[in-house]
Every structure is written in structure tokens, then in C-alpha cells.
Amino acid sequence: FHQVSGIHVRNALCDSFGYYQAANKVLAHGMMAASPMGKLRQLTVEVMQAQGLSAEQAERVVEEGWCIPDPVISAKQFTDTWTLFSYLHQQNIKIGIATSDDRAPTQAMIEAFDIEEFIATMVCSDDGIPSKPAPDMVTTICQRMNIEPSKAMVIGDTTSDLKMGRAAGAGLVVGVLSGVSAAKDL
């Protein structure tokens, strides 16, 4: 954004997003950990306005400078996802995905990991359904798969994931350490 606006905004953006620059780390309770891309984009506009730009100028700068990283390049599998999902599928366990990411990058990752055949349904942040920690993503997935939330397991790596699962009445809510949250937070 500095190249587009001439304003040094790195520190302000990192503070607003919940990114600790010195450790190169996303903070577990920060906006970057579980916020939809649209919300992060709007926050960027607000940060630019706080730097003295008008709403129109801030929107133009963000429009010109906004860049979404390639999800396939940035994604890291924490296990052999195909083998895990294949095994769950063989056990007749349905898999639904509720993500704070947008649909296009999520679909690209699913295709890159070659797991499309195992995903029964997914809800993404740009689907128009209230996002985490609201229960709506889980309840929507359960409705689509024709199961009661009390029969569902929600697995997540952020506190927003776990709050969403509990709010939806999931039968089991499991925190995993594959994301930015520490065990004490989950």
C-alpha cells in the first residue's frame, strides 16, 4: 500500500490485523486469525482512512494495492489429507468445511490436495452466511448433510472455530494445533 499511497502503513496494518512483526506471527486472537477476507479488506480501508485519506482515496488505494496470496502456494498440509479423508469417507463419515476464507481459494486448495470427492459440502466467508463465531456455518452444513448438530463434530484451530461449534450445539468440539492458536487458548 506504501507504493500506491506513499504512506507508511505496515505497522498500523500489522497492529490492526493482529500480526506480530518481530516474531513473524499471526496472533491467535487477532483479526487475521479468523476474519473473512472481506472484513480484512474493509479494515485495511479503515486503516488507510486513519492515516488521513478520505474514504474515496482509501478505497482507491486498497483497490489498487489489494493482493490475495495464492492459496495453493501458501497452504501447508499438516498430514496426508487425501489418506485421512479417504479413510473417513470409507467409514461413512461425512466431511463439511466451514471456513473464513473465500470460496475460490478454498476450492483451489481442495483441488490441489485432490480431496474434492470427500467433501460433502462447504460454507465459505463469501457465501453470505454469518461467519464465525456465529453458529450459522455449522448449522448450514448440518442442514445440507441432513444431520443434527448434536451428531456433528467440529474440528478447528482457532477460538472462533470452537465458539462456532459450541454455539451451534455440536456434539463434540475439538481444538487442534495446526493453526495460530496455542493449546491454552483452545
Q: PLM features: residue spans?
A:
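A metal-dependent, Asp-based hydrolase signature
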Residues: Q3-C67, T79-T83, Y87-Q90
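Short acidic capping loops at alpha-helix termini that bridge into adjacent secondary structure
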Residues: E56, E116-T121, P149-M153, L172
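Substrate-recognition element of Asp-dependent hydrolases with the DxDx(T/V) motif
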Residues: R60-G65, V72, T81-E111
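Surface-exposed amphipathic alpha-helices with a cationic face
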Residues: W82-Q90, C142-Q143, L162-A167
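Histidine/lysine/aspartate-rich catalytic loop segments that bind and position anionic ligands
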Residues: T99-K132
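Phosphate- and divalent-cation-binding pockets in alpha/beta enzyme and binding domains
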Residues: P105-A108, T140, M164, D185
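Conserved Lys-Pro-Asp/Glu-containing loop-to-beta segment of HAD-superfamily phosphomonoesterases
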Residues: K132-L162
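Acidic, Mg2+-coordinating phosphoryl-transfer loop and its flanking beta/alpha structural elements
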Residues: M153-L186
